[in-house]
């Protein structure tokens, strides 16, 4: 059985000498793992996490791990390795994909979203883009937040809370009596022009973290790369 697709390498682990298992997030087939062999400097460069590749997967049966062959399309290593904010953001997003997506489950629209994010990240780290990535990931896994209007009154102004139950924004008037039980909605998620304060960064990360923990991080398990990103971001404002 053969699978041919374009993909992003999101994980690589050693199997034996010069042999590795890579996990690739493919455009049309979701996550696929395959065995690759490294016998040259060129092949080592090809099989780096974050590389966009032409991916060929071969196995006798669909349920096997299979062998993989890759041709490099684009490498992001040089853009990320010298900038901690970019590197930690990159490590976080690929670790979240590996953690939350199931093997061989198609996410073709999200694949395009990821490629666009990596292109933007290679140019400049933007915290707003990172949070929008996490929100898009929540939506892709079935837990979309509606931050466009109040979930009760339907007004589109004075939105400052998010209901942890409905995942919808709430206006100041509606949410005020219950504010101690609500999540805060950072202003920068409602306007592309607003500057982002440290407190708003905390609010944004608390917002996505709540829904990750409630629905996706089983047994309160955290993604280490995401924790590293959060610590760096909040301590280097």
UniProtKB/Swiss-Prot annotation:
Keywords of the record: DNA damage, DNA recombination, DNA repair
Ranges in a coiled coil: none
Keyword DNA repair found: yes
SUPFAM superfamilies recorded: ArfGap/RecO-like zinc finger (SSF57863), Nucleic acid-binding proteins (SSF50249)
GO CC field: bacterial nucleoid
Source taxon at top rank: Bacteria
UniProt-listed GO biological process terms: DNA recombination; double-strand break repair
Gene3D superfamilies: Nucleic acid-binding proteins, Recombination protein O, C-terminal domain
Role description: Involved in DNA repair and RecF pathway recombination.
Family assignment from sequence similarity: Belongs to the RecO family.
Name this protein carries in UniProt: DNA repair protein RecO
Protein's gene: recO
